[in-house]
Amino acid sequence: MNEFSILCRVLGSLYYRQPQDPLLVPLFTLIREGKLAANWPLEQDELLTRLQKSCDMTQVSADYNALFIGDECAVPPYRSAWVEGATEAEVRAFLSERGMPLADTPADHIGTLLLAASWLEDQSTEDESEALETLFSEYLLPWCGAFLGKVEAHATTPFWRTMAPLTRDAISAMWDELEEDSEE
């Protein structure tokens, strides 16, 4: 697993799973103890420090639920809610064609798309590099800026207000890397 994959896996997990999910305990422990920064491949120390200082799990969970859960959520985490004419089925078909195992949850969720990027990067054949470019250019970039802007605007906790720019910068850095790789 390389740095690109780690970024996508960490960010994808934080968006995909509710904060109280037992599978996130080790990740939140790393954040709370300031140890995530030691393994974080981007220069985002200030943002990571802000995350570390804002790990009140009750507040983080309540904010997550208000932001992302239910029909009345403040910021729908699904591509189909942001891109006119987009469907979850087209994302599911794209990922299925590449052999990615998918759960019954919506495939166009921001967390699923970031986890898919990690999975595709871990597969790492020439074809998967092209698949990663497609994932970013068609399924992530067209809406993630608006989505993250709304997360930042509607979040009531410093944690989620910080996750938005942290994610935005990471996605931008990963896209830059993909573009550089495709030019070689």
UniProtKB/Swiss-Prot annotation:
Signal peptide: none annotated. GO terms for biological process: bacterial-type flagellum-dependent swarming motility; DNA damage response; protein maturation. GO terms for cellular component: cytoplasm; cytosol. Disruption phenotype: Mutants show no swarming ability. Keywords: Chaperone. InterPro entries: DmsD-type, DMSO/NO3_reduct_chaperone, TorD-like_sf, TorD/DmsD_chaperones. Pfam families: Nitrate_red_del. The keyword Chaperone applies. Acts as a chaperone that increases YcdX activity, maybe by facilitating the correct insertion of the zinc ions into the catalytic site of YcdX. Involved in the swarming motility process. Belongs to the TorD/DmsD family. Does not bind zinc. Interacts with YcdX. This is Chaperone protein YcdY. It comes from Escherichia coli (strain K12). The lineage of its organism: Bacteria, Pseudomonadati, Pseudomonadota, Gammaproteobacteria, Enterobacterales. The gene is ycdY.
